[in-house]
């Protein structure tokens, strides 16, 4: 019985850690700070095409998380990369992938994702 409690406690600690851990290679920015920097960077929307077409930040390129492996060479290493998705989960995954596979150093994400965005959007 004690063994089960230890396993349960291990799972709880793991999920709490995953929830609140902030990767050192990714900077999470408020909308105000995101707007200040993304015009001088590569702005990448990692949502799926249907989500992107429903509305996206003006100037963003759509490279869905599902296509990132095939299209990662479209992202330059020598410029900052500003990422966003609907809520933040996919942008974190994309940042981890770009850091590991492409060696991208300058990575930023929109805090709260597109659902928290109140700035200008473009719809197709």
Q: Which residue stretches match the model-derived regions?
A:
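Conserved G/P- and acidic residue-centered "switch" motifs that form tight phosphate/ATP-binding loops
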Residues: 45, 88
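Short, surface-exposed ligand- or partner-binding patches at beta-edge/loop junctions that are enriched
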Residues: 84
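Alpha/beta-hydrolase fold nucleophile elbow
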Residues: 81
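Rhodanese-like catalytic fold shared by cysteine-dependent sulfurtransferases
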Residues: 1-31, 37-41, 49-78, 92-124
